Amino acid sequence: MFSPLGQFKHIVCPFLRTGRKCQSRNCFFSHDFQNSTKISPPYSENVEGYPKVKIEKSLPYKYDNCKLSICVPIVTTCIPYHSVENLNFNIRQNISTTLNLEKTNDSIKETKNENFRMDVLETYKCKQLNHQTTHLPTNTVLKKRSLFNDAISIVPNKKKQLVSAISTNSDSQGASSNIIPTPKYDSNSPAGHELRKRMTHLLYESYKDLGYSNAESSMLALLDEKNICETANSKMIYSSSCKSKILSLKKAPKKNEIQGSTPDEKLESLVHSEEELILWGYNIGDVAPVNPPDELRECDRCGTRFADPRGPCTYHWGKLFREKQGGEKIRTYTCCGVKEGDSSGCIIEDNHVFKYRHLPYLASVHPFSYLPDSTNSKQLSHCALDCELCYTTNGMELARLTVVAKESIIMDVFIKPKGKILSLNTRFSGIHDAKELESGITMDQMYIKIKELGMNKNTILIGHGLENDLNAMRLIHKRVIDTALLFTHARGPPFRYSLKYLTKKYLGTTIQTSTHDSEEDAVSALQLVFYKTKSNESQN
């Protein structure tokens, strides 16, 4: 296989070195054990037959508060048993060490002295060499470890000192300069790393504006960004969730204002900004009434366009839910479990129904109005409300209003609709008898009652999906706490969690077991807001 060039004749045969007989007929190595050249291993000058390892010049090493990487050459040739006792474990002179370090700030480089770095380096060298001895036979390992005891004992517990020095130095550095936090790189994140760094920077600046220190702002920004990154599953959702969080921080109270604040002041910190309300579809401006140009309406249940509301109307009242069946993703209805397209509906009603979504059309049925600036009697600082609606010839109209303050009902009335009732929408409104609506109060009488309660422009209105309730009441109000916005969905706008889900998750209670109840929904929304204020207190 090889030509007889004698390239290995100066190396003693491995079998002879270990005291065994060479079985090879034409061995490439030298069998002249006495006259062969004595080659020293890297640890000693008196070990026979050991190949010499090239000693590389150690590169200048530096220390910082980043990762510490130590590369030590590992000898693959087994050391003869009789040579272990003659080994000289001089770590500094005989082992080539390379420290691959990242860039660091000049302040950290100047503060670290040479002696401390050498001690830290010696600790890692000793540990690395101690790890290599596991490749030797058992009795050799014991002998070699005994030689390490003195070397290791002179540098006790330097790793803990290193970690302590890094944390102390980073704290002092964060207090003295603005260091923008950088999120940890993740190849599986929904957004690119540059976008993540930009959003983390904006979150960091938002916390800085609230009076938090550099270290606190950095920690909170990284924590918020990490939570959003873990819950989002696309770049668009990640971006919208970050923007929503930044908007909420803009109207949050200063750090020094949180301590010792009253319950009303704590609620004040949760009031949504106008930008956030517009993002989620709230109306905060005047609305001019416009009559619908087309008499044809689209059924809100079956999608049929009609001029005469008389049915029949066949539809599915449940929502479409995507699930896997037989390895295939299909959409089924939650009401009956039927696959999409297999049935036109599982419920048959006598009339088609519709609702206006365009605000000018809503204003043509009843105009929008504002709450008064102040009331002559009592002032209502905050309250929770919930509305129930029914279908009429004018679309969806307000049927019931419930107002709750301090978890007790202060107003619960039925509202008489202007149009003819087509459907009570009992499954979602909880109203079973149309006579209750016929004997109810009008919209104008409702405005008088809520003013008598003390509602004004400064009152904080609390609810879930409150933009629909305000549109049903034809109210324009900017001081709102919406639990759908307070507990934002992981996918961002326009997705939102249901009140039933939030109540079960955060309060541990189950609501809406049969039909919707406006009193139950209003109390649940108020309890969720109180839960949020307590949660914010524990975080601060």
UniProtKB/Swiss-Prot annotation:
Record-annotated Exonuclease domain positions: 382-529
Name the UniProt record assigns to this protein: RNA exonuclease 3
PANTHER family reported for this sequence: FI18136P1-RELATED, RNA EXONUCLEASE REXO1 / RECO3 FAMILY MEMBER-RELATED
Keywords: Cytoplasm, Exonuclease, Hydrolase, Metal-binding, Nuclease, Nucleus, rRNA processing, Zinc, Zinc-finger
Taxonomic lineage: Eukaryota, Fungi, Dikarya, Ascomycota, Taphrinomycotina
Family: Belongs to the REXO1/REXO3 family.
Functional note: 3' to 5' exoribonuclease required for proper 3' end maturation of MRP RNA and of the U5L snRNA.
Molecular function (Gene Ontology), one example: nucleic acid binding
